[in-house]
């Protein structure tokens, strides 16, 4: 590990646990990334794409209706307004620029909810790169609008039927492809997890979320928030929000994992709260696993949070007490999803609804407390409307006009 340019670990978590054939590939990627970060032209090109193609900066919106009856001020960082519909577009643009700089001619990616796949497909279309997307067959079925979007933009989408046919299996398939085709192919990993240097690369391309949020909240309120809250699957939207606040110790960092059908049922995706440390997906990190080390299936109503592990920097932030990680059930996320749509006219992604649900819990616990909260609304909910409609119909929920 001493041969790496950057520290591959966050405390005890992280590392490069990959087949020997991929070690030089990862080190070349790290070298190219370090050089690109020192190149003003690369940075200018990246920031120009974020501004004039993706639509940054994104808005910071105050929720005036959801907080009625309390003394809380609640703001949403509107990554749902980014081109592509989620925060994923930020780091995808950065990684594809990096791949082109390295002379790669093909992009592969995994996707769960389909948002990373859509972001990869749109950026590949615009930057002229062939694109192969791996997606669990279960997710292909529940995220059909995003599958159509990817194919419309020229991506080849492969439904992975192995294992549980979910995100972790798509990740494994993408890694296999990369091991066979690394000479001309870049694996555009979609979250702040996996082997070094991916967690660092993804964080650096996502940190603009927190940088903008800090500037915007200071301009609006004249002070830093009491807490920033973000959903955590692999952890990219959360680390993008948290990064600029880590040194601001007055700001609580709250990550929200999926409790699924309830932690006690075992059907959840909360490795930070209820996992044990293991080796998975090229890294050492908290993991949902059996006592003998077999990977357990994660579960969430949200495809993008349905992942049995988490990025190593989140594990480190938890270990040193800088960030706290809570969990929200499917039902709580569904309630927040409906509340935001009904009272603010914003339809969030189910992933983002988990973060919002925890913020609403904080408000309900202490309505008289004056507090300033920011939720990272990491994506829009267009992709989830059919899932939500089906579930609410089964529950007998009807939609009545005001």
Swiss-Prot record:
Gene3D superfamilies for this protein: 3.40.50.1100
UniProt keyword rRNA-binding, yes or no: no
Keyword Lyase: yes
GO CC annotation terms, alphabetical: cytoplasm
Enzyme class, first EC level, given as a word: lyase
Residue numbers bearing the N6-(pyridoxal phosphate)lysine modification: 88
GO MF annotation terms: tryptophan synthase activity
Domain of life of the native organism: Bacteria
Catalyzed chemical reaction(s): (1S,2R)-1-C-(indol-3-yl)glycerol 3-phosphate + L-serine = D-glyceraldehyde 3-phosphate + L-tryptophan + H2O
Pfam families noted in UniProt: PALP (PF00291)
Subunit-level organization: Tetramer of two alpha and two beta chains.
Function of the protein: The beta subunit is responsible for the synthesis of L-tryptophan from indole and L-serine.
Pathway named in the protein's UniProt entry: Amino-acid biosynthesis; L-tryptophan biosynthesis; L-tryptophan from chorismate: step 5/5
Family: Belongs to the TrpB family.
EC assignment: 4.2.1.20
Transmembrane segments: none
InterPro entries per UniProt: Trp_synth_b_CS, Trp_synth_beta, Trp_synth_beta/beta-like, TrpB-like_PALP, TrpB-like_PALP_sf
Protein name according to UniProt: Tryptophan synthase beta chain
Keywords: Amino-acid biosynthesis, Aromatic amino acid biosynthesis, Lyase, Pyridoxal phosphate, Tryptophan biosynthesis
């Amino acid at each position: 590990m001493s041969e790496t340019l950057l520290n591959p670990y966050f405390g005890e978590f992280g590392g490069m646990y990959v087949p020997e054939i991929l070690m030089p590939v990862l080190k070349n990627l790290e070298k190219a990334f370090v050089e690109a970060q020192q190149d003003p032209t690369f940075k200018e090109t990246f920031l120009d794409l974020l501004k004039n193609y993706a639509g940054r900066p994104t808005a910071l919106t105050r929720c005036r209706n959801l907080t009625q009856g309390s003394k809380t001020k609640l703001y949403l960082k509107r990554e749902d307004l980014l081109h592509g519909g989620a925060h994923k577009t930020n780091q995808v643009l950065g990684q594809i620029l990096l791949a082109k700089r390295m002379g790669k001619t093909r992009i592969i990616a995994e996707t769960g909810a389909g948002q990373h796949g859509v972001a990869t497909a749109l950026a590949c279309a615009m930057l002229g790169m062939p694109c192969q997307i791996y997606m669990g067959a279960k997710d292909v079925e529940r995220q059909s609008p995003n599958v159509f979007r990817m194919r419309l933009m020229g991506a080849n989408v492969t439904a992975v039927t192995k294992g549980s046919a979910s995100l972790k299996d798509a990740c494994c398939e993408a890694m296999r492809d990369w091991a066979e085709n690394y000479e001309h192919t870049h694996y555009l990993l979609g979250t702040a997890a996996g082997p070094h240097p991916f967690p660092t690369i993804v964080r650096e391309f996502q940190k603009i979320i927190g940088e903008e949020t800090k500037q915007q909240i200071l301009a609006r309120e004249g002070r830093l928030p009491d807490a920033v809250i973000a959903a955590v699957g692999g952890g990219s939207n959360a680390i993008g929000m948290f990064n600029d606040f880590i040194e601001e110790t007055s700001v609580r960092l709250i990550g929200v994992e999926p409790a699924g059908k309830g932690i006690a049922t075992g059907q959840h995706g909360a490795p930070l709260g209820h996992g044990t440390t293991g080796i998975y997906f090229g890294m050492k990190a908290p993991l949902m696993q059996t006592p003998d080390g077999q990977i357990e299936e994660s579960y969430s109503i949200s495809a993008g949070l349905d992942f049995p592990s988490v990025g190593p920097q989140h594990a480190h932030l938890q270990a040193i007490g800088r960030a706290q990680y809570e969990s929200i059930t499917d039902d709580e996320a569904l309630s927040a999803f409906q509340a935001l749509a009904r009272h603010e006219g914003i339809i969030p992604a189910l992933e983002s609804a988990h973060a919002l649900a925890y913020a609403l819990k904080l408000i309900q616990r202490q309505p008289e407390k004056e507090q300033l909260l920011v939720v990272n609304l990491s994506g829009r909910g267009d992709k989830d409307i059919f899932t939500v409609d089906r579930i609410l119909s089964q529950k007998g929920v009807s939609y009545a006009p005001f």
